[in-house]
């Protein structure tokens, strides 16, 4: 029972495809391994292999090269979905890689995950797709500012957008909920939640 909308930058469509592949594998007794399902899944969408594997991972290539990483440290995540959708294809078509001035610190992020350093993770959060999606949808920047101004450890657009998420320490549960309440009062916000990381133990 999931409620991830499509065109939200949260792999909602890919999660549906991954669930369908796993269900068919079970219902028809195909006995395909996750690796085999992932090979089929990438033909449907770049994020499908990740949704089949689950957990925290470094994704490379177009999404088919996955390296497992330690789970996200326990925290609170405020998620806000503006009442708009965005085409992933359009965002990637308009990304000017050669004009990017900064690139995410992938190695530093991996090290922070390995040591469970939540601040190290939030300090390294970056998304180059913001350079495309935010200028076309200023509401995303407004949502980011609201969350940032309410003491989040870090705030970022998810995937190709328009969903935004902010990270809060577990001790700030009341603050995170107040931010959610503020977001829900805004007409331009379709949905807002405060959740915890859903960490999957692989192989179970």
Model region roles, listed by residue range:
Residues 8-34:
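DPxDG-like acidic metal-binding loop motif
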Residues 30-153, 167-204:
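ATP-dependent small-molecule kinase catalytic core of the GHMP/sugar-kinase superfamily
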Residues 1-9, 153-155:
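Short pre-catalytic strand/loop immediately N-terminal to key active-site residues, enriched for Gly-Thr
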Residues 164:
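Surface-exposed aromatic
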């Amino acid at each position: 029972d999931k409620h991830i909308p499509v065109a939200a930058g949260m792999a909602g469509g890919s999660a549906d495809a991954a669930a369908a592949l796993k269900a068919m594998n079970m219902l028809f007794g195909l006995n395909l391994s996750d690796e085999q399902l992932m090979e089929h899944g990438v033909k449907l969408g770049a994020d499908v292999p990740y949704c089949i594997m689950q957990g925290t991972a470094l994704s490379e290539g177009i999404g088919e090269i996955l390296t497992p990483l330690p789970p996200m440290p326990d925290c609170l995540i405020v998620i806000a979905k503006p009442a708009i959708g965005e085409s992933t294809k359009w965002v990637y078509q308009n990304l000017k890689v050669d004009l990017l001035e900064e690139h995410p610190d992938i190695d530093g992020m991996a090290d922070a995950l390995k040591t469970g350093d939540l601040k190290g993770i939030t300090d390294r959060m970056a998304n180059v797709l913001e350079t495309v999606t935010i200028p076309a949808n200023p509401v995303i920047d407004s949502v980011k500012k609201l969350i940032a101004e309410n003491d989040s450890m870090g705030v970022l657009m998810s995937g190709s957008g328009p969903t935004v998420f902010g990270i809060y320490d577990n001790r700030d549960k009341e603050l995170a909920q107040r931010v959610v309440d503020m977001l829900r009062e805004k007409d331009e916000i379709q949905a807002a939640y405060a959740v915890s990381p859903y960490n999957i133990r692989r192989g179970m």
